[in-house]
From Swiss-Prot:
Bias (Low complexity) ranges: 97-111
Keywords from the UniProt entry: Hydrolase, Lipid metabolism, Phospholipid metabolism
One GO cellular component term: nucleus
Annotated region (Disordered), positions in chain: 1-142, 666-718
Designated name of the protein: Intracellular phospholipase A1
Catalytic activity line of the entry: 1,2-dihexadecanoyl-sn-glycero-3-phospho-(1D-myo-inositol) + H2O = 2-hexadecanoyl-sn-glycero-3-phospho-(1D-myo-inositol) + hexadecanoate + H(+); a 1,2-diacyl-sn-glycero-3-phospho-L-serine + H2O = a 2-acyl-sn-glycero-3-phospho-L-serine + a fatty acid + H(+); 1-hexadecanoyl-2-(9Z-octadecenoyl)-sn-glycero-3-phospho-L-serine + H2O = 2-(9Z-octadecenoyl)-sn-glycero-3-phospho-L-serine + hexadecanoate + H(+); 1,2-di-(9Z-octadecenoyl)-sn-glycero-3-phosphocholine + H2O = (9Z-octadecenoyl)-sn-glycero-3-phosphocholine + (9Z)-octadecenoate + H(+)
Domain DDHD: 564-827
Chain's gene name: ipla-1
Annotated GO MF terms: calcium-independent phospholipase A2 activity; identical protein binding; metal ion binding; phosphatidic acid binding; phosphatidylinositol-4,5-bisphosphate binding; phosphatidylinositol-4-phosphate binding; phosphatidylserine binding; phospholipase A1 activity
Domain of life: Eukaryota
Function as written in the Swiss-Prot or TrEMBL entry: Hydrolyzes the ester bond at the sn-1 position of glycerophospholipids and produces 2-acyl lysophospholipids, being phosphatidylinositol (PI) its major substrate. PI is a versatile lipid that not only serves as a structural component of cellular membranes, but also plays important roles in signal transduction through distinct phosphorylated derivatives of the inositol head group. Catalyzes the hydrolysis of phosphatidylcholine at sn-2 position in vitro. Regulates asymmetric division, an important property of stem cells in C.elegans, by controlling the subcellular localizations of beta-catenin.
Segments of skewed composition (Acidic residues): 681-694
Notes on activation and inhibition: Inhibited by E-6-bromomethylene-3-1-naphthalenyl-2H-tetrahydropyran-2-one (BEL) in vitro.
Organism field: Caenorhabditis elegans
Single biological process term from Gene Ontology: phosphatidylinositol metabolic process
Amino acid sequence: MSGSEEEHLVSLTFRKNEEDMDEDEGKVKQKEKPKEKQMEFVNQNFVESTEDESEVSTPTAVGLPIGTSTPDGDETPTQPDPNGKYTMAQTKDADLSRPSGLPSNGNPGSSTTVPPASKSGPVAPPRPSGTPVAPQRNRRRKVTELKCSEVRWFFQEPKGTLWNPFNGRDSIMLEIKYRKEKGIELDEAMQEIYDESLTHYKMEMKDEPEIENGNIGMEQEKPMVVVMNGQYKVNKDNSKIDPIYWKDDSKEIRRGSWFSPDYQPLEMPLSDQIEKNHLQCFRNQMIPEGTTVFSKSETSNKPVLAELHVDGYDIRWSSVIDISLHQKGNAILRYLWAKSTPLRRGYEKEADWNDAAAEISHLILVVHGIGQKGYENLIAQNANQVRDGVVSAMEKVYPEEKSRPMFLPVEWRSALKLDNGLTDNITIPKMSSMRASLNSTAMDVMYYQSPLFRTEIVRGVVSQLNRTYKLFKANNPQFNGHVSVFGHSLGSVICYDVLTQYSPLMLFDKYVTKSIDEYLKRDDTNASEEARKALEAMKLAREQLRDNLEGGIHKLLVTKEEQLEFKVKYLFAVGSPLGVFLTMRGGESTDLLSKATNVERVFNIFHPYDPVAYRLEPFFAPEYRHIRPIKLFSNTDLRARASYENLPLDVYKHYLKKLKNLNKAKKNKDDKTADARSGGDDENEDEDECDSDEDARSGCSSPRSMTPPPFETAAANAAAAAKETKAVKKGWFSFGTSSNPKKTQSTASLGSVNATSTENIEFAKEAAEELPLAEKILGSGVRVPHRIDFQLQPALTEKSYWSVLKSHFAYWTNADLALFLANVLYCKPLKPEEAKPTWA
């Protein structure tokens, strides 16, 4: 072909052709339309310089001649101009999705043989089978502004590197807020959602002035959009989310419209510029299917239809969907490091309004105890740990349950002034670290015992409880579930006092009244007649005050600042010293669960090695000290998924042995032998706390075995457990001492071993009668209305000093406790015919 013919071919104008293809018959029809007015332009963003050939992509012809129609009926838009730059000829509905017909070397002056168009019109080459399929939303769509659902918002943890997507509803709410403030029109679907569900947020345009009292431009108060299950609120400039119920846990957020191949969002300024240029160049162009329009052989020779230079990056368009990001630099650096990164427009999955957090059916307020001074955010982490454990347990045990509980932290220590640092001033400087630790932990207990600081602590806790509840209700107005309190350590004591409206002044009032009565009864007093009459009048006035004042004198002592504004269903006292506090107050069973108690039920949950925890059931009857607390089954045990309400009473093993020895002593009339053989109760009590669950009573208290052992093998199991216990039990707290089980076994006589086996066999047979025996032990004394004490199971390795120290803080991540909480909150009451335990 001569140069004049080539020049004539290159200068041909594009003609608009419309093509209708019949897929069944394989026929193609073409119709010509009058040529519309063409507008040629040269855009710097569409220019590929030929000076540096290392930067120039040299696409080859892809089978379509210049000036012919694409399968969609649009002309190929790319042609070289006489100046050596690519020129875009726009026509109505021009399709820039795939460039074609470029010279093989990318040089407009080179000679290229271009095949003539067939009479039936050009046919697009078949798409490679390995080409990824684009999302459904990209099929047969034109390039327009992204819908709200195509944009996805992300958050990043403070020390994280990855961006995590919000759920569909949170992302839509953030995008609607963003567009309302920017004055960007919502698409039809999002406008409908806004009108139905989000009008109460009153999202205003950012630049809209407010006219009030003659002041123009006063910034309006932005609505508080809450995300992440209602625990975080969005700041005014949509750059981060701040926690609502605790402090110092802000997370950066980012609006994602353009993404890397792994769908990590680009920075918002860069994304906005790319989006603006993309719409300017490709608006109303058809979006083809797949993630690229080029085959594997063509990827190295992609043309550059448009280019954008932003902050050290080059963004290049090879088609509507083939966009790549390049780092700037010289040719060597680009060759070594700066490989192009494909970009994706719109998130891989559209946001769905129904993709929301589970409905909240129960609110649990988590109150910390001692040791929080200087660690204000620790309780927030602990509350999240408990919630994660409960949710994980519910996914396994209650997969059909759609709702979830919400655990919110209540941090009360940092807001208190107490002695204004006087304790720190009087602390001896020697061993300062240890003394500072004691001041931040043990001093909280002493503060609470002080009549001077106790009121400040109680009011501080009540204030934070009410504040958290009000915030939650404001952010979740549809919530109508129950509220419970999870109190740890000293926090459980404070919450119990708040719920029972206990005041130490009541105890003081009783003491004063008793002193007056004793004084008036004495005859040897030197008080005058007038003084005696004044005391009698005071006593009578106090009695009338109790009788006539609604609520009695108690109402005068307990102020409004010490009362909750909501009803509490459950109190979970975890690792609680409540028992010893009640003992120091002279408490009785009537005081433990009085009529004034503003709670439905109390659960006293403790670890057997926790030095701070105490039992509560012996308050009702001293005989309960012989009854075991309910042992929580392991979370891997099938029995842990059933209710604990129907478990029989379980008597301590050491007490059973003591009764058996006493009975033998009575038969043999040998009191000395009975005394000798009934000794060592402390050692047996330790055995009770960590005995093997494979004994005869495992049907009542076994926490680890999946199924209870048959009664026929219980005796053998008990004997084996006894041998193992004797070998391991020695040195429970003995460090640095040597223990030789083989030596111990060799020194034991065969007769003693046989006697031990016989005793365990007899003991296993007696275990079947534990329930009636427990009833006999309790007799006609006061009974608990429901079981209160619940004991966690220690791990096999938790027999050391360190285990004792850390057991008080091991509740937050305990899986057995998490499953128990889930059962209490969501387990449905059993019918009478189902009341029998499934493992019985």
